[in-house]
């Protein structure tokens, strides 16, 4: 949608949309903002969806909605920060989106996210982790060849460290 809007603005300003489209075609996602990558981690072939830079209620729900066609087998979710008194309710409200994706494993980082996932009435294995290092260890134990791993969380919660470990492997 953003790309289409950008092309419409270029057109309305009288710029060459063909040039804009060519430049847009070479655009790559910034680290932690939904980039897809494939490779091996500890000898296991995986696809990583790294959305570890930002997490709020709306961006979490939008991310879950974008995953419905090819849902991940493993989700690594860290807390949404700076939500104040509404934090518990905002985390609990994520449950339907997670349930709809039917992940095999949900690894959570942080108290609020772990509390939410522990209450999920689904067949997914829930692995709570105190920090990114523990989450990476739990991830190692569950990876299977061909898995898609989705990582989402607030930058300050450290989910990006899990993604960095996978990318650098």
Show which residues each predicted segment covers.
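ATP-dependent carboxylate-amine ligase
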Residues: 4-169
């Amino acid at each position: 949608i953003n790309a289409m809007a950008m092309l419409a603005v270029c057109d309305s300003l009288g710029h060459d949309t063909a040039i804009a489209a060519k430049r847009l075609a070479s655009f790559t996602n910034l680290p932690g903002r939904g980039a897809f990558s494939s490779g091996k981690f500890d000898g296991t072939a995986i696809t990583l969806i790294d959305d570890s830079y930002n997490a709020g209620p709306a961006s979490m729900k939008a991310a879950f909605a974008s995953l419905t066609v090819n849902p991940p087998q493993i989700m690594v979710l860290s807390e949404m920060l700076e939500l104040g008194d509404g934090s518990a309710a905002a985390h609990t409200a994520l449950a339907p989106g997670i349930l709809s994706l039917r992940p095999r494993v949900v690894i959570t980082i942080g108290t609020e996210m772990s509390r939410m996932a522990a209450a999920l009435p689904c067949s997914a294995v829930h692995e709570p982790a105190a920090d990114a290092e523990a989450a990476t260890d739990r991830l190692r134990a569950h990876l299977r060849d061909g898995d898609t791993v989705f990582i989402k969380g607030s930058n300050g919660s450290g989910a990006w460290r899990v993604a960095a470990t996978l990318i650098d492997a």
